[in-house]
Amino acid sequence: MNFLAHLHLATLADSSLLGNLMADFVRGNPQGSYADEIVAGIRLHRRVDSLTDSLPEVKQARQYFSDEFRRVSPITLDVLWDHYLARHWLQLVPDTPLQTFIDGAQSQIEPNLAQTPERFQNLNLYLWPERWMTRYAELPFIADVLHRMSVRRPKLAALSGSFQDIEQHYHQFEILFWQFYPRMMQLAKTQQL
């Protein structure tokens, strides 16, 4: 899961959006460094990541990647799941338009950025004004995201090439998304994540 799915599941679970969004920027035990609700959000994010990676559908999705890209497939899939969520948002969340949801999340997160890691603050300079989460619905934007990540971190250079496997197996990935994401939503709603 990437930014959009973490915010969506956090909302369903009534968890801190700030904690869930910044979790990847916090190392180690967050207890004592942040308010309890933010710590709980960070921990929810980590549980969601762990659960998602262990799902049979996600393990199956990794098998669609070529050998040269399988190592980075967990990262590629995190971004791809956000693509399907953005693309099918109104089917999954019929009561709230995507932009309304994103605006609400932004209004909860931005006033509290001063207490967050600098790298996370820098992310927020681009995430909201460039409308990343709305643009996740656009497949060319997903290619751009993967390419930018590969340039920023040379060890992840294969991310850029992994997009060809997305194109080749797009519908298979989409079927797998529909098999697991509604279950994740239900787990979040019932506080079972």
Curated annotation (Swiss-Prot):
Its EC number is 3.1.4.14. Pfam families: ACP_PD (PF04336). It comes from the Bacteria. InterPro entries: ACP_PD, ACP_phosphodiesterase_gpbac. Keywords: Fatty acid biosynthesis, Fatty acid metabolism, Hydrolase, Lipid biosynthesis, Lipid metabolism. It is an enzyme of class 3 (hydrolase). The keyword Repressor does not apply. Disulfide bonds: none annotated. One of its GO terms (molecular function) is [acyl-carrier-protein] phosphodiesterase activity. The keyword Hydrolase applies. It catalyses: holo-[ACP] + H2O = apo-[ACP] + (R)-4'-phosphopantetheine + H(+). GO terms for biological process: fatty acid biosynthetic process. Belongs to the AcpH family. Converts holo-ACP to apo-ACP by hydrolytic cleavage of the phosphopantetheine prosthetic group from ACP. This is Acyl carrier protein phosphodiesterase.
